[in-house]
Amino acid sequence: MAQALLNAGFGNFVAADRLIAIVSPDSAPIRRTVSEARERGQLVDVTCGRRTKAVLIADSGHVILSALQPETIAGRILNSRGDLSGA
């Protein structure tokens, strides 16, 4: 079975089927989640030095920081699944 990969920006790809959440990094609980993932060694930063605009949370506990907007990432997932309704 082929694994669906999601372009997380700057030539970096993430397994789309493993994602459980795509959130904005602005709230205190998400900042705490990012900090805890860094301490556990499960933080993946794919921003290439740019500002973090989305935090992707995987079912394995890994937290991925992306410089793309959450809406952009969600749109890419919907497009890859063939669901263009956006709902």
From Swiss-Prot:
It comes from the Bacteria. It holds the Pfam family RemA-like. It comes from Synechococcus elongatus (strain ATCC 33912 / PCC 7942 / FACHB-805) (Anacystis nidulans R2). Belongs to the RemA family. Coiled coil: none annotated. InterPro entries: RemA-like (IPR007169). This is Putative regulatory protein Synpcc7942_1027.
